[in-house]
UniProtKB/Swiss-Prot annotation:
Biological process (GO), any one: positive regulation of cytokinesis
Main location: membrane
UniProt function note: Receptor that may play a role in the perception of bitterness and is gustducin-linked. May play a role in sensing the chemical composition of the gastrointestinal content. The activity of this receptor may stimulate alpha gustducin, mediate PLC-beta-2 activation and lead to the gating of TRPM5.
Keyword Cytoplasm: no
Side Extracellular, residues: 1-7, 64-88, 150-182, 254-262
The gene coding this protein: Tas2r13
Source species of the chain: Rattus norvegicus
An annotated Gene Ontology molecular function: bitter taste receptor activity
Subcellular location: Membrane
Protein name, as recorded: Taste receptor type 2 member 13
Amino acid sequence: MGSSLYDILTIVMIAEFIFGNVTNGFIVLTNCIAWLSKRTLSFIGWIQLFLAISRVVLIWEMLLAWLKYMKYSFSYLAGTELRVMMLTWVVSNHFSLWLATILSIFYLLKIASFSRPVFLYLKWRVKKVLLLILLGNLIFLMFNILQINTHIEDWMDQYKRNITWDSRVNEFVGFSNLVLLEMIMFSVTPFTVALVSFILLIFSLWKHLQKMHLSSRGERDPSTKAHVNALRIMVSFLLLYATYFISFFISLIPMAHKKGLDLMFSLTVGLFYPSSHSFILILGHSNLRHSSCLVITYLRCKEKD
């Protein structure tokens, strides 16, 4: 049973890895081509580009962690290699979450219609607001790196002191749990901001539909379509990142560390977020969707030839 489950999880993980690289690679390629051909790229184009790059790094980091664990178990978990892997994961995870949150804020400010002076002030200065948020989240990243680096230093000291294999394994379980808890703690703020943006956009859509109903106009006007499309992208991000959270909590289950399948299962669940959300971004953005249709048409023509 354990062997069969392991094989199934391996197949699913490889499929997610390929799918994630294809979808995120497509976003990177599309925006790079647009930038090179037009010599310019929209602000959201840059956000999409760096979001996709961060997710490619995150996907590869998760795969490398799995391969290292399968080959060397706990014996490699010390030194510069551990530091590089941990900090790369922290940085890629940070930007993957924060850039998606910035997209959610962009949808809210661009699409929602509120008459509050504060909202109108932010709406008219949307690029400056998003740039300030982007710069401000670097403070979170700095503190996160400092905290993780402290845990790494503590683990390195314990690794040198503890000679027996069992003691090193137990110490690493404690170290990994601390790192995961830090990741969860630093993810709460951007996730909450994205959730609030989603709720406000729902409220904006409700108000808009009320106005449309009173004026006896159709409900499928451009503003309604923009609201619905943005909400689809935002709810998919929230749900998929929630599964990513769940993968963290799975890794925190004490008994799972003794069975060997915890890493496989948590990585399989975790990979679903960076792989799938980028596909939804492609479907939700007209330029990416148009480019994907051109690629599919080209491939079909090549297949017929």
